[in-house]
Amino acid sequence: MFDANCLKLMFVAGSQDFYHIKGDRTNALLDTLELALQSKITAFQFRQKGDLALQDPVEIKRLALECQKLCKKYGTPFIINDEVRLALELKADGVHVGQEDMAIEEVVTLCQKRLFIGLSVNTLEQALKARHLDHIAYLGVGPIFPTPSKKDAKEVVGVNLLKKIHDSGVEKPLIAIGGITTDNASKLQKFSGIAVISAITQAKDKALAVEKLLKNA
C-alpha cells in the first residue's frame, strides 16, 4: 500500500551515477544505498539510464534484485524507474514513469492494485491532466533547479511550477526533483517531499548529506 510519507526523501540512483569513482560502479551503488538506508531515506528509486548505465537486461535485473533486497532489509519502499515489466516481475512496491515512457493509461492497466505509480510532470497542463487518474499515487515535478544528473533533463521549471500545481487544486502528493542539494532543499518544505541523485551519490559524507536533507525536506 502507498503511504505518502515515503516521499519525504527519495533517493534515485543507478550504477551510472557513480561515474566519478574508480572501481566497480555497481558495488558503489549498493554500498551507497545501504548507507542511505541506514541513514533513513524514505524510499529508493532504481534508475538505469544513459550511456554509462548497464545495458544487459540480465545484469539490470540482477542489480535491481540486490537493491530490492537491501530495501526489504530496512523496510523501505523500492521503486523502479520506467521499466514497468521489470517492476511487475520483481513485485516492486512502485514504478515511476515519465511523459515519454509507456502511455500512462497502459501503465495503470498493468499496475493497478499491484504496485503504486508515480508520474513525472513538467508543466501545469500535465499535472491537471493527471489529477483525475485515480491510480497515480504521486506526481514528480521538475527539474526544479539545474541538474547535472540527467543528460535528457527538461528545461528548469523552478519552485514556481510546484506552487502553481499546488494552488491549482491538484490534490496528489508532489515530490520535487532536479538539482536539489542540502543548501536549497529547505525551499521545498511545503510540498510532500524531494527526490535526489547527486546530493547523495557525490557527497563526501553521505550519511551527513542524508541527515541534512531529511532535516530540510
Swiss-Prot record:
Q: So what does this thing catalyse?
A: 2-[(2R,5Z)-2-carboxy-4-methylthiazol-5(2H)-ylidene]ethyl phosphate + 4-amino-2-methyl-5-(diphosphooxymethyl)pyrimidine + 2 H(+) = thiamine phosphate + CO2 + diphosphate; 2-(2-carboxy-4-methylthiazol-5-yl)ethyl phosphate + 4-amino-2-methyl-5-(diphosphooxymethyl)pyrimidine + 2 H(+) = thiamine phosphate + CO2 + diphosphate; 4-methyl-5-(2-phosphooxyethyl)-thiazole + 4-amino-2-methyl-5-(diphosphooxymethyl)pyrimidine + H(+) = thiamine phosphate + diphosphate
**Which domain of life does this protein belong to?**
Bacteria
What cofactor is this protein dependent on?
A: Mg(2+)
Q: Which GO terms describe its biological process?
A: thiamine biosynthetic process; thiamine diphosphate biosynthetic process
Query: Any idea which positions bind Mg(2+)?
Result: D82, D101
Q: Which UniProt keywords apply?
A: Magnesium, Metal-binding, Thiamine biosynthesis, Transferase
Where along this sequence does the record place binding of 4-amino-2-methyl-5-(diphosphooxymethyl)pyrimidine?
Answer: Q45, F46, R47, Q48, K49, N81, S120, K150
Quick one: which pathway? Cofactor biosynthesis; thiamine diphosphate biosynthesis; thiamine phosphate from 4-amino-2-methyl-5-diphosphomethylpyrimidine and 4-methyl-5-(2-phosphoethyl)-thiazole: step 1/1
Q: What is this protein called?
A: Thiamine-phosphate synthase
Taxonomic source organism: Helicobacter pylori (strain J99 / ATCC 700824) (Campylobacter pylori J99)
The gene for this chain is thiE
